[in-house]
Design a protein with these regions (language model features):
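Short, low-complexity N-terminal intrinsically disordered segments enriched in polar/charged residues
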Residues: 1-54, 58
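A beta-strand edge to alpha-helix "cap/lid" segment located at domain peripheries
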Residues: 2-26, 88-94, 101-173
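Generic detector of well-ordered alpha-helical segments enriched in charged/polar residues
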Residues: 34-41, 57, 80, 84, ...
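Hydrophobic alpha-helical core bundles mediating ligand binding, dimerization, or RNAP-core interactions
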Residues: 40-44, 60, 83, 113, ...
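General structural signal for alpha-helix termini and helix-helix connectors
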Residues: 46, 65-66, 118
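A solvent-exposed, acidic/Ser-Thr-rich amphipathic alpha-helical stretch
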Residues: 53-104
Length: 173
């Protein structure tokens, strides 16, 4: 597993290669920009096998950079497979987008992730908040996706030894 807080070479290269000044981009809040963001919201708001199978490669560019708390990928197909595999332990999943901000081709989406795990009673939702930094190519597809969220809130505390260790560390802080 990697840590998302250390800017490794692949992250720095993707950040440099996706600089907004290197490509045409839509004007702020124009129809094209709104359409880009609506595609992202539609993809994550219906976080189902059918929707992800069909639309991940429509929203992400073929060559893209994706990094979250667990994995790092550089293709839309790898992202699609990762997202589909992530559904296996879940009864249901949803993302609620709270707000977004943009600055010169950089987009920041503030979200709440809600997961209902199969091993818990149905309707027992685990929630976590996060922010995603995105950049888009001139076709309106994602070429850079960096998630910032704390997996201890929702995933690691489901593992007994990790739960105890996290509680101990938080108690010492």
């Amino acid at each position: 597993m990697h840590t998302q807080s250390i800017p490794d070479a692949r992250y720095l290269q993707a950040l440099t290669q996706s600089e907004p000044y290197l490509r045409e981009r839509p004007e702020a809040m124009c129809e094209a920009e709104t359409a880009m963001l609506e595609r992202v919201v539609a993809l994550f708001s219906d976080y189902s096998y059918e929707n992800l199978s069909k639309n991940v490669t429509e929203v992400y560019a073929e060559k893209t950079y994706f990094r979250d708390a667990f994995k790092q990928f550089e293709s839309a197909e790898a992202i699609r497979k990762y997202m589909l595999a992530g559904l296996e332990p879940l009864e249901d999943a949803e993302f609620v987008f709270n707000r977004f901000a943009s600055n010169g081709g950089d987009y920041y989406l503030d979200w709440t992730m809600r997961l209902d795990f199969k091993k818990t009673p149905t309707g027992t939702w685990e929630e976590s908040i996060g922010v995603t930094h995105m950049r888009f190519n001139s076709e309106g597809k994602i070429i850079f996706h960096q998630d910032y969220w704390d997996p201890t809130d929702i995933v690691y505390r489901r593992i007994p030894i990790a739960k105890q260790l996290i509680a101990f560390v938080k108690g010492k802080m």
